[in-house]
Amino acid sequence: MSVEIKTNTVDPIRQTYGNLQRRFGDKPASRYQEASYDIEAVTNFHYRPLWDPQHELHDPTRTAIRMTDWHKVTDPRQFYYGAYVQTRARMQEATEHAYGFCEKRELLSRLPAELQAKLLRCLVPLRHAELGANMNNSSIAGDSIAATVTQMHIYQAMDRLGMGQYLSRIGLLLDGGTGEALDQAKAYWLDDPIWQGLRRYVEDSFVIRDWFELGLAQNLVLDGLLQPLMYQRFDQWLTENGGSDVAMLTEFMRDWYGESTRWVDAMFKTVLAENDANREQVQAWLEVWEPRAYEALLPLAEEATGIAALDEVRSAFATRLQKIGLKSREE
């Protein structure tokens, strides 16, 4: 007895969804494309939001920036929800190992008292700035249009929440888990002169109505100066002064910043290339917020690293802006 097995090849009738076929042609789409393009409704809205009746739910006039299609702004990381979660899970696994190692061996509590005090005063209060960044990016995700734009900002918001929690854990490692360090860090944020400039900048950013201007003030300008200052220059100072163990607790922030700048720079390059009006508007916003961010960070830099470190960071930031197509006031 013999058994004959035949195989047939089934060719798909359609390679992809209709909206992606119209955008990219009749070919298989990537997971990122399937999860990111033409997601939100653009017609037949049921009602205008009661909290802002001047705008539709997905309204392009919430910003002064004009794009023929906001889907031109894409994520060079190709992050949709699945890819984002998998990437962060790998990063978090390494970070949790570092925190566990530090906690088990009580590395922070063994640091000299003056170094612990400096960590508590100059680093842990940043948890409040991270919450501000979380709120700002959540706001942008709510007001912006095109999922290629909104998803980048909501992922950014979740990252900032996580980074704030890591800073809180550094405080708990300093005080043995009592929470006293977090209370002290809050007092620094509210009352210490070195934090009041940054606090005012963060709180003023909460009332920026144009979501793209808010993205510039938070993700381009403030992060472009604050992140290198505290997680590169201050980390270097700690290493040179006996606090090298802290570096393993802030490695997530350094890796995250290097990744984050990719999509931020790509977004601004795309928007600036769209038309001259966009370029002029973004440059005008930059001339307002960059000097403010620099002035806000001066007292913190003077206490944490020295003002020269902030000036070096600003010079590097000016080079970054030039590559994007903008001009720093520092030049």
UniProtKB/Swiss-Prot annotation:
Tell me the route in metabolism or biology where this protein functions.
Aromatic compound metabolism; phenol degradation
The enzyme's main class, written as a single word, is: oxidoreductase
InterPro entries, alphabetized: Ferritin-like_SF (IPR009078), MP_mOase_hydro (IPR012078), Phenol_Hydrox (IPR003430), RNR-like (IPR012348)
Q: Which SUPFAM superfamilies match?
A: Ferritin-like (SSF47240)
GO cellular component terms, alphabetically, are: extrachromosomal circular DNA
Q: Which Gene3D superfamilies match?
A: Ribonucleotide Reductase, subunit A
Q: Which UniProt keywords apply?
A: Aromatic hydrocarbons catabolism, Monooxygenase, NAD, Oxidoreductase, Plasmid
Q: Any one Gene Ontology biological process term?
A: aerobic phenol-containing compound catabolic process
* Quaternary context: The multicomponent enzyme phenol hydroxylase is formed by DmpL (P1 component), DmpM (P2 component), DmpN (P3 component), DmpO (P4 component) and DmpP (P5 component). The oxygenase component is a dimer composed of three subunits, DmpL, DmpN and DmpO (DmpLNO). DmpL interacts with the auxiliary protein DmpK (P0 component).
What family does the database annotate?
Belongs to the TmoE/XamoE family.
Listed name of the protein = Phenol 2-monooxygenase, oxygenase component DmpL
Which species does the entry assign this protein to? Answer: Pseudomonas sp. (strain CF600)
As recorded in Swiss-Prot or TrEMBL, the protein's gene is named dmpL
